[in-house]
A protein has these predicted regions:
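Active-site-adjacent "subsite" loops/lids of carbohydrate-active enzymes
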Residues: 17-34, 106-179, 229, 233
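Glycine-rich, aromatic-flanked loop segments that form ligand/cofactor-binding clefts
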Residues: 52-59, 63, 90-148, 186-189, ...
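Aromatic- and acidic-residue-enriched segments that line the glycan-binding/catalytic groove
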Residues: 67-79, 113-151, 189-228, 281-287
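Aromatic-lined carbohydrate-binding/catalytic grooves of carbohydrate-active enzymes
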Residues: 50-86
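Aromatic- and glycine-enriched glycan-recognition loops and surfaces
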Residues: 32-50, 77-101, 167-171, 246-253
């Protein structure tokens, strides 16, 4: 289904301005639909005709491959068994047509997912350099599981606490902002995959640095799993959630600094969870 998100935003003090009306073009859902330029033009014209004034172009879904000309990442050519090779620049064509129609453009990328566990497709399944850099899950049976092996997860997330992962993600942002004339950059999946991640040695060490002291009996001192799948809080339970929120918010600050160092007119946007029960598990509990 091509229309995945409609959002209107209202800001105090801007009553004299036209309010943004966004239409989000998801990369995966529209992979086959937008195999041709004509189709992109058709839907952008439709969007304009019904009152939208800004479009969000998703160019890096959960696979870690992309729909723009990149020197960092390979092109996305296969989704759900459908193979499409484009000899034209998907993102640039969206921008050109949007400008023709007077539409603003937000570009969106999935920040930390780089593979699809259900099908073993994507960057982290194809390149060994990502071994040990994906999230490590602490499962209800008390075991540790590489997220690449968890078929239930929406994406195989890289570990956001790692400096090399953050540097890699920032390089993607930098490449797009330098090479494409966009109005805004939206961070999608800029979070943890869930409350069972990440329990790697990297996160253990970073958590100790955050607290300023050693954390023994990890992860039991964070929490243990009860037989019914609920959690039994440990000594550092609350500190753990605050730490994870800080991992994400500090990265968002880095992205903002990077974008504005290149072009301070490009706005930073963020696809945030609206479900209150999920924000702690995903590191989006900013009030912490």
């Amino acid at each position: 289904f091509f229309l995945l998100l409609f959002a209107t935003c209202s800001f105090a003090g801007n009553r004299g301005k036209e309010q943004p009306k966004y239409l989000w073009f998801d990369a995966e859902a529209n992979f086959e639909r937008f195999a041709s330029k004509d189709s992109i033009s058709y839907y952008l014209e439709k969007a304009k005709s019904v009152g939208f004034n800004q479009v969000v172009v998703d160019v890096k879904p959960i696979y870690g491959e992309v729909l723009y000309k990149s020197k960092i990442l390979p092109p996305l050519t296969t989704v759900n068994g459908k193979v499409i090779h484009r000899d034209w620049d998907y993102l640039q064509y969206f921008i050109n047509e949007a400008r023709r129609l007077g539409l603003k453009v937000t570009v969106s990328t999935a920040m930390f997912p780089s593979g699809h566990p259900a099908t073993n497709e994507g960057l982290v399944y194809e390149e060994s350099r990502w071994d040990g850099k994906t999230c490590l899950e602490y499962t209800p049976d008390g075991k540790m599981l590489d997220i690449r092996e968890d078929k239930k997860k929406v994406g195989a997330f890289l570990n956001p606490v790692r400096k090399d992962v953050r540097k890699f993600a920032l390089s993607i942002v930098r490449e797009i902002v330098k090479n494409y004339d966009v109005d805004a950059y939206a961070l999608d999946y800029c979070r943890y995959p869930g409350d069972d991640s990440d329990f790697s040695a990297d996160s253990h060490k970073a958590f100790e640095h955050y607290l300023g002291k050693k954390v023994r009996n990890f992860p039991d001192n964070i929490f243990t799993w009860n037989a019914d799948g609920t959690k039994n809080p440990g000594v550092y339970y609350k500190e753990w959630w605050a730490f994870r929120a800080n991992v994400i918010t500090s990265f968002v600050k880095e992205v903002r600094k990077e974008i504005h160092s290149i072009n301070n007119k490009v706005e930073l946007e963020y696809w945030a969870a609206s479900w209150i029960h999920g924000i702690y598990g995903q590191g989006q509990n900013w009030a912490s």
